[in-house]
Amino acid sequence: DFDKKVIEKVVQHIIINSIKHDISINLSLESINNTAFIAWIKNKIIENKTIAAQLVFSATAYAVAKNVDKFKFFADEIHKCGAKIIIKRFETKFIPLGNLKDFNLDYIRLARDYTCDICKDHSKQSFIESISDLAGLLNIKVLPENVKDDEDMEFLKKYNLYAVSR
């Protein structure tokens, strides 16, 4: 019920304030795994189809890894309605890079461990290069989060990343 209330508030906020940008809505593992919730959310998106493309539903990589098949179903159903999907705190210990093609994702927000001190760590640099290349092929936008160091920020600008947050 909490996730439903948040979604209703976000939809109203977008409509009332004529918001034009996308808004991400965090969902619980329980909601993503609940077929009744998925039916409800599909109806809510369809009722508000003019803003569907602005709704980005978010799950953690950990939640996705807990039930991959349910998440795939959820992502496919959300996309059928015109909304978007992001996996946040993405880590390969939960979802291997090779498995990204199995999901229908719009965005990946990387765990901050991948970018902290990246300018000094060749394995992190290789990872960012790999995920950037793969995401480009899969049409997924990559967002490194919470980059603190100016050197790391400058280094990340070399890659074809959608955005970097500080």
Question: Where in the sequence are the language-model features?
Answer:
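Ligand-binding cleft/hinge of the Venus flytrap
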Residues: 25, 131-135
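The catalytic core of metal-dependent phosphodiesterases that act on cyclic dinucleotides
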Residues: 44-118, 134, 138-166
